[in-house]
């Protein structure tokens, strides 16, 4: 059978990335406590393409991914190595996104319910292996300016804290979720009874924060964590009284701590 992908290409244009995108894939995520949580991930992966090759064999991505059942740096590096060998490439890239549920107790009545967060894993291999993980966590923010100038209440809304990190040691997704939540006005809960709602509302009012405040506070927490070698923080507020959202972002290296 004729191999069209292996035909010689005369245009002599190398391609940086060629691959598949948004493939749904079952995975197991290791829990911080014990056991695994099953999830359905969206996978995108690619390799570089030599200037004399017309195309890649897309089916080979799936063949390599058949060995991917859970998320660890060791497994990711093996998948990338296999892609490089199978595709006769110099560089391979892998990106995975998936929903993850953390179980939380409401602050007063201690009712337990799951909170969905979005998790990201990104890995690349050329000469060296690089690996990043991240989370996107829903939180609750109350506006300091609105509180200061209003006789009654203050506008408040959901916000999302997105954290991406590179680490020298293993770090749990739950650890990043905790960092995001403790630097917001108040965490978000799926299930709240009236005593819980009272607590959350009053706590947010006592702890007002701009998106700028949250981004800076999260960055300072990440700076102090010896496991983390690089980070990027992005905070977006779903503004309740404006016809736009507000955001703030910061990356390691954007500032130098004094003192």
UniProtKB/Swiss-Prot annotation:
GO MF term list: GTP cyclohydrolase I activity
Pathways involved: Cofactor biosynthesis; 7,8-dihydroneopterin triphosphate biosynthesis; 7,8-dihydroneopterin triphosphate from GTP: step 1/1
Example of a GO biological process term: tetrahydrofolate biosynthetic process
Gene3D superfamilies in alphabetical order: Urate Oxidase
Stretches that traverse the bilayer: none
Reaction catalysis annotation: GTP + H2O = 7,8-dihydroneopterin 3'-triphosphate + formate + H(+)
Alphabetized InterPro entries for the sequence: GTP_cyclohydrolase_FolE2, GTP_cyclohydrolase_FolE2/MptA
EC class of the enzyme, as a word: hydrolase
Keywords: Hydrolase
Pfam families: GCHY-1 (PF02649)
Disulfide links within the chain: none
Enzyme Commission code(s) on record: 3.5.4.16
Site positions per UniProt: May be catalytically important: 143
Protein family per UniProt: Belongs to the GTP cyclohydrolase IV family.
Functional description taken from the UniProt entry: Converts GTP to 7,8-dihydroneopterin triphosphate.
HAMAP family: GTP_cyclohydrol_B
PANTHER family in UniProt: GTP CYCLOHYDROLASE MPTA
Protein's name according to its UniProt entry: GTP cyclohydrolase FolE2
Protein source organism: Thermotoga neapolitana (strain ATCC 49049 / DSM 4359 / NBRC 107923 / NS-E)
